[in-house]
Amino acid sequence: MAFQKILNFCTNELGSFYLDIIKDRAYTCHHDGPARKSSQTAMFHLLQMLIRWISPIISFTAEEAWKEFSNDESSIFEKEWYLLVEPLESDLDVWNDLINLKDEVNKNIEILREEGSIGSSLDAEVHITFSENDFLKFSRFGEELKFLLLVSNVSLSVSDKDLDEPKIDIKVSIDEKCERCWHHVADLSDHEGNKICSRCISNLSFPGEARQMI
């Protein structure tokens, strides 16, 4: 049971969601900027917990991982259970809803991909029509929503009718692709022979772009 829960967490929440999302921060944000450091801090805490979780199940792997990850000479089996210094306030229901929304967006993108209309999800622009309650729930993410859904642009609206499920419309972006982050953006600038977006230009110098730390 414990092994299955850990495997599901690594496959679903990490592999299919979080790690996919933070690639943009890891590869395109300033290397010492707060946006990239935020995701690195999250990964640090995740590894602290994950190595402890797997230690009773795959002990040698856990010990090897601990030696690579930590400068601590002691064994992982000498460590206490890892707890964050301060508990994080997070609305888990909203995040579960966001994962479900991302799954639905991906299904729609996959249909276009099978038709040959689209390649990468970053080729897509998404418009989502919500009920009023769902609009308030998701609009709080602002510009961060396009990074969470791995698309180039997201626009939201409120339906004048009752909706049980969000209505998702996807179109292929007509904007040019930034040569650095691969997002499609209306206005690109020439920078040392490369056509890149204003976000990437800001990320070339410290501290880089301002992002919600999620």
Walk through the language-model features, giving the residues of each.
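Acidic, turn-prone loop/beta-hairpin segments
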Residues: 19-108, 115-130, 155-157, 162-168, ...
